[in-house]
Curated annotation (Swiss-Prot):
GO molecular function: hydrolase activity, acting on carbon-nitrogen (but not peptide) bonds, in cyclic amides
Name this protein carries in UniProt: Dihydropyrimidinase-related protein 3
One Pfam short name: Amidohydro_1
Biological process per Gene Ontology, one example term: forebrain development
Tissue: At 16 hours post-fertilization, expressed in the presumptive nucleus of the medial longitudinal fascicle, the presumptive trigeminal ganglion and the spinal cord. Expression in the spinal cord is strongest towards the rostral, more mature, spinal cord, and weaker towards the caudal spinal cord. At 24 hours post-fertilization, expressed in the olfactory placode, in the telencephalon and diencephalon but not in the proliferating ventricular zone. Expressed in the epiphysis, the nucleus of the medial longitudinal fascicle and in the area close to the nucleus of the posterior commissure.
SUPFAM superfamilies in the cross-refs: Composite domain of metallo-dependent hydrolases, Metallo-dependent hydrolases
Phylogenetic placement of the source organism: Eukaryota, Metazoa, Chordata, Craniata, Vertebrata
Gene: dpysl3
Length: 567
């Protein structure tokens, strides 16, 4: 891989650290052991370790020691209509570190028609200058042609990108047709990429938005009313279908509704290689706030797909996350100031979309899923760190506490209780969608690149110390099954003799129409009735057939069939 690292950027001076008496928790096991770190790498794990002098010793006192969190979905320093999101790479990564996350994966969003490579270089420069923790990049495909195809191949082979997002919404801007989705998924499947999808039916959303505005609904409630969860579920089903046909691993971002989550759950049970990503907000809050009398508060919840107005949705999504039907949690952290949100004060379609969640992500999951008994500590590590590392092909460098892994880890205090408020959070946004929530579980100490960056509530993060972590193609976590299926799915024609029977004559099919049959009729023998010819007539109703008296029509055993069933 030819990616060249940044130059003249501050480096974290790694410490020699020894964590003693901790309970190491990985996604597959928990055990008590000491950890010795040097040069940003875990060097030893065990009891009675022999370590050099000058080591800083940290007493974990039996507390959990977990891999640093990986936030697989952020939008930091994102340009939007001449402005940028409230949190740049410095502010956003500080918020992440404060919550126990030691690596983020940001989305590069090229303007339609612009070069993907140029956008990637621009985002890389911003992150190199400001990120306080390690980072990787997804690249969003906002248009599709031969030139873009070549750039995607370059990004995979030379730039360390293995995941690309496409959009099924945002009509006339980013939205792709089914044909384009098929072509993108096919190409990514051949080159070892992960197809990410923003799943909503953009065509119907556009119609519903216009209808809401015509009715005089201009506030944030119009956002959720114009985007019912069925439109998310339909798009997810369509994306799963196309990905299955192209044998490409699919990653559904922002799973916000029960219906969409159910589609993913059913697909996984059928063997589809699909990963679902609920976000911090969909696990921790709901869409009832869109009807708040406070416009600024209501607008702070505007994101797409919208948060579900069904208040039981977060608990439902946490249950599917705990069971493994949903795979990984991102924050989709994308914050705007009140003034920026007010761009859409008279038209909800103009409200900049995005919510906070990078800092709160791990505590929300612990409080809503682990404390409630839905999820154990090992699954907590899987959905906050390990699964993301595996999907991005970074495991076991990231997402695991093991000898040779990066020394990114967290001492997690299961007894800590904190109240979320915008007054003390590390984001620059004035609102926090989790305002007032009392959450159990928080980081007590955070080590990033072998250096303590959070201790006793004090953050010691340095702008520009984050490193770009390249992601290689064909991650086993997704592609082992795909490769096996490709070997079994070779299509072959059926050997048969030449057909030498009669052939009907038809006029050439016109585009957009149906073929016109010639005057020749299909061969029949008199007096046998031609069963291909309809006996239906518009001349009047036929007499109903006579039934013997007393005979009842009953529903067949098992009930009437339902051709709309997803099963």
């Amino acid at each position: 891989m030819s990616y060249q690292g940044k130059k003249n950027i501050p480096k974290i001076t790694s410490e020699r650290l020894l964590i003693k008496g901790g309970r190491i928790v990985n996604d597959d096991q928990s055990f008590y052991a000491d950890i010795y770190m040097e040069d940003g790498v875990i060097k030893q794990i065990g009891d009675n370790l022999i370590v050099p002098g000058g080591v800083k010793t940290i007493e974990a006192n039996g507390k959990m020691v977990i891999p640093g969190g990986i936030d697989i979905h952020t939008h930091l320093q994102m340009p939007f209509r001449g402005t940028t999101t409230a949190d740049d790479f410095t502010q956003g990564t500080k918020a992440a570190l404060a919550g126990g996350t030691t690596m983020i994966v940001d989305h590069v969003i090229p303007e339609p028609g612009c070069s993907l490579l140029e956008a990637f270089d621009r985002w890389s420069k911003w992150a190199d200058e400001k990120a306080c923790c390690d980072y990787s990049l997804h690249v969003d495909i906002t248009h599709w042609n031969d030139s873009v195809k070549q750039e995607v191949e370059t990004l995979i082979k030379e730039k360390g990108v293995n995941s690309f997002q496409v959009y099924m919404a945002f009509k006339d801007l980013y939205q792709m047709s089914n044909t384009e989705l098929y072509e993108v998924f096919t190409f990514l499947g051949e080159h070892g990429g992960i197809a990410q999808v923003h799943a909503e039916n953009g065509e119907i959303i556009a119609e519903e938005q216009a209808r809401m505005l015509e009715m005089g609904i201009t506030g944030p409630e119009g956002h959720v009313l114009s985007r019912p969860e069925e439109l998310e579920a339909e798009a997810v089903f369509r994306a799963v279908t196309i990905a299955s046909q192209t044998n490409c691993p699919l990653y559904v971002t922002r799973v916000m509704s029960k219906s969409a989550a159910d589609i993913i759950s059913q697909a996984r049970k059928k063997g589809n290689v699909v990963f679902g990503e609920p976000i911090t907000a969909s696990l921790g809050t709901d869409g009832t706030h869109y009807w708040s009398k406070n416009w600024a508060k209501a607008a702070s919840f505007v994101t797409s797909p919208p948060l579900s107005p069904d208040p039981t949705t977060p608990d439902y999504l946490n249950t599917l996350l705990a069971s493994g039907d949903l795979s990984v949690v991102g924050s989709a952290h994308c914050t705007f100031s009140v003034a920026q949100k007010a761009i859409g004060k008279d038209d909800f379609t103009q409200i900049p979309e995005g919510v906070n969640g990078a800092e709160e992500r791990m505590s929300i999951i612990w409080d809503k899923a682990v404390v409630t008994g839905k999820m154990d500590e090992n699954m907590f590590v899987a959905v906050t760190s390990t699964n993301a590392a595996k999907i991005l092909n970074l495991y076991p460098r990231k997402g695991r506490i093991a000898v040779g892994s990066d020394s990114d880890l967290v001492i997690w205090d299961t007894d800590a209780v904190r109240t979320i408020t915008a007054k003390t959070h590390h984001s620059a946004a004035e609102y926090n969608v989790f305002e007032g929530m009392e959450l159990r579980g928080a980081p007590m100490l955070v080590v990033c690149q072998g250096k303590i960056v959070l201790e006793d509530g004090n953050l010691h993060a340095t702008s520009g110390t984050g490193r770009f972590i390249p992601c290689s193609p064909f991650p086993d976590f997704a592609y082992k099954r795909v490769k096996a299926r490709k070997q079994l799915a070779i299509l072959k024609a059926v050997p048969r003799g030449m057909y030498d029977g009669p052939v009907s004559e038809f006029s050439p099919m016109s585009r957009g129409g149906t073929p016109s049959a010639s005057t020749r009729t299909s061969p029949t023998k008199v007096p046998v009735r031609n069963l291909h010819q309809s006996g239906f007539t518009l001349s009047g109703p036929e007499e109903a057939p006579i039934r013997p008296a007393g005979r009842r029509i009953v529903v067949p055993p098992g009930g009437r069939s339902n051709i709309t069933s997803l099963s």
